[in-house]
Amino acid sequence: MVNKSRMMPAVLAVAVVVAFLTTGCIRWSTQSRPVVNGPAAAEFAVALRNRVSTDAMMAHLSKLQDIANANDGTRAVGTPGYQASVDYVVNTLRNSGFDVQTPEFSARVFKAEKGVVTLGGNTVEARALEYSLGTPPDGVTGPLVAAPADDSPGCSPSDYDRLPVSGAVVLVDRGVCPFAQKEDAAAQRGAVALIIADNIDEQAMGGTLGANTDVKIPVVSVTKSVGFQLRGQSGPTTVKLTASTQSFKARNVIAQTKTGSSANVVMAGAHLDSVPEGPGINDNGSGVAAVLETAVQLGNSPHVSNAVRFAFWGAEEFGLIGSRNYVESLDIDALKGIALYLNFDMLASPNPGYFTYDGDQSLPLDARGQPVVPEGSAGIERTFVAYLKMAGKTAQDTSFDGRSDYDGFTLAGIPSGGLFSGAEVKKSAEQAELWGGTADEPFDPNYHQKTDTLDHIDRTALGINGAGVAYAVGLYAQDLGGPNGVPVMADRTRHLIAKP
């Protein structure tokens, strides 16, 4: 999971249904089962939910931990640990009778540490632009040359016609042209590095030069005030930056039931990769285990109205690359054929919360990740809120902030939702009172660390949230209608997602 999320209490619009926990499993009497999309669908959903056990999900997590242990403690894309994770999921699905696809995609991953600019004995912090070159350990040094300050500074080599740019470190203000154009103009005139001064005084802006740009020199950004200070000075200037770009190929894993309408596909996904720093057993082995066990228990040819497609994404931790690549590969008809997408990323945090994605947009405007989410997402949220009520948990919202693999689907207009147990954000006192756990501590103190191991999985959260995967999949596999349904084919609006 990437980026930070903001969480607020959800507006609950469902009746409380009595439930109880028994040895890590949740059981409901016939009378307490919720009628959401119809009684037959609810019966099927509860039956599927009851077949997805905590022990089975823990067994999948144990396998993923073993894979990480055998591969330098990681399952990150581009490592043998990721390849072994793909093989495990593929073999498990094939052993359950699924036809499995492993579409390959290419990506470039940029990594950088904070850079510095030194002039006249003073050092200031700078931020690499994505896909910048790095410098040698001692940096690159040259006289500081400032481009003219105008509406389009440094956008053309001619902007430097009367300036001694060759061998210099060039300072240019942010303007109307792309950063890659500024880099190219300075590089053509022989600059050894480029500093771009932002037009605001917040954090250094970052930005990208573009994955397909032939970058020739290091490029960093500084704030407006730092840029102003630099512009008033002269003399030898050194830029230091540790940065690299890695190109790789990776695979997603896709499997679909052989039964059910292919014009109304219910899609459930979880990212399969970890960060390089750790094994990723909560983030996101927990989501993988829940989706995988749901597939195993549903089977390859269930008696369902709508086909179910299971997805295990690669390179989420490097910017949602696998899922975004998949959505970009689909035409309008294929996008319309996906009735909804359910995303499961971090379900068993050790200090867990019980969050649903904010499909009804009940968060305050400034807390929403997207100004609008696709029609139908509110119904999905209500389904998960109702499920958590059954499990004895009161849901709170987490925003659609582009943090996980739902992002490409929502941008394409596909109704989306899911469950989430929290990451690096600290649990409030009110949340600790609501759910238990420790206030003022992160939901997952092991987030993106080597300590994200099997030993730190919360079994109760895994049992509740993992069962929620099966419940929602089973419900929508049988019925897409009702108050918590999604638009029918004729009413679906979809958008092509362009490749960068």
Swiss-Prot record:
One Pfam family this sequence matches: Peptidase_M28
Binding site for Zn(2+) 2: 283, 317, 448
All residue ranges annotated as the PA domain in the record: 140-231
Cofactor(s) it depends on: Zn(2+)
Leader sequence segment: 1-24
Keyword Hydrolase: yes
Active site: 316
Enzyme Commission number(s) from the entry: 3.4.11.1
Family designation: Belongs to the peptidase M28 family. M28A subfamily.
Protein name as annotated: Probable lipoprotein aminopeptidase LpqL
Lineage: Bacteria, Bacillati, Actinomycetota, Actinomycetes, Mycobacteriales
